[in-house]
A protein has these predicted regions:
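Carbohydrate-active catalytic/glycan-binding domains of CAZyme proteins
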Residues: 1-324
Length: 324
């Protein structure tokens, strides 16, 4: 039995702080791969792997501002470093206000799925110019392995829409969906992806219109879909709300509260389903942000409790044990 200490700075097997904020866990061939943001000294997407969700081995900076680029479409912008001669406007208060001589862009909330047809690992993320949140784009990258160097294919507005906080979801039949905050965060959009997962093919649903939701997390339990998310309040935590549906493209239940009024001082990052269990166990992972000290933010992982197929909740525990 292994134990997690919530709300602390977790460290990898080399003793270094784990930087994987706004992240995602992919289970692949017996390993849990954890992807997330690293803004400690440079702006990277990091990858870690573990067999037990406790001991995390650092696998590298899998996407950086120096990553290989390969265009997929003339509509995709390959920029990973800002042009020093271009005016990007006023710095947004949520963008880190510190010296950035390398003019890096922001790659936020990276999520990765495996495409069995193309045999590629496909990353989607939220892209911004590093100064403010005016671009509101999605970004795509691919790799032949889960922890190798991803090739960057560019940023874009899916089907012409704004796209900020985001997540990915892969259904049982292999169909993939990209979910993101759109229309200045007022609405939540669900897009069905192309078979290769490299583009948004159709906007299949608009959820919570005018509700200003962000940090979306979508998962499936049995035959029912669930979505978690927070309200837009900057670095300040707020009440997590959830909804559920029998159809990802159909009608969803009204939003309902879960956890407490600050979601235990976290914002949703992802939900991971534990493999090989007689009864499915779903774990909520939240980032406990440190505001301007973004790089020292910590993590909270909690088991989700289900009551029937339309209700869920999770309670806080300082220590959480996992038996894998």
């Amino acid at each position: 039995m292994k134990t997690l200490k919530n709300g602390t700075v977790w460290k990898d097997t080399d003793g270094n702080p784990i930087h994987a904020h706004g992240g995602h866990i992919l289970y692949d061939n017996g390993w849990y791969y954890w992807y997330g943001e690293d803004r400690g000294e440079n702006f990277y997407v990091n990858c870690y792997r573990s067999k037990d969700l406790i001991n995390w081995e650092f696998r590298g900076h899998v996407l950086t501002t120096e990553s290989e680029t390969k265009p997929l479409s003339y509509e995709y912008d390959l920029t990973l470093v800002r042009d020093p001669n271009k005016d990007y406007g006023k710095r947004h208060e949520l963008c880190l206000d510190r010296e950035d001589p390398f003019m890096k862009v922001n790659i936020e909330r990276p999520k990765v799925l495996y495409n069995a047809k193309t045999k590629k690992y496909v990353m989607w993320a939220h892209f911004e110019n590093g100064m403010n949140y005016d671009y509101a784009r999605a970004a795509v990258a691919t790799c032949d392995t889960p922890d190798g160097q991803f090739v960057y294919h560019g940023s874009f507005n899916p089907l012409g829409y704004m796209s900020r906080d985001c997540t990915l979801f892969q259904d049982d039949d292999g169909t993939a969906y990209f979910i993101s905050s759109s229309n200045n965060n007022a609405d939540t959009h669900i897009y069905r992806l192309s078979e290769d997962y490299l583009s948004a093919e159709e906007l299949v649903n608009r959820l919570f219109v005018g509700e200003f939701r962000e940090a979306p997390v979508l998962f499936k339990r049995g035959g029912r879909y669930y979505i978690l998310g927070s309200y837009c309040s900057g670095w300040d935590p707020n009440q997590c709300k959830f909804s559920s549906s029998n159809s990802i493209c159909g009608q969803w239940e009204p939003l309902r509260d879960c956890a407490d009024d600050t979601t235990f001082h976290t914002q949703p990052a992802f939900v991971v389903k534990l493999s090989g269990k007689e009864e499915d166990l779903f774990l909520y992972m939240g980032d406990r942000w440190s505001g301007g000290e973004y790089f020292s933010s910590s993590y909270v992982m909690l088991p989700i409790e289900f009551k029937g197929d339309k209700e869920l909740d999770f309670s806080y525990h300082d220590d959480f044990s996992i038996n894998l």
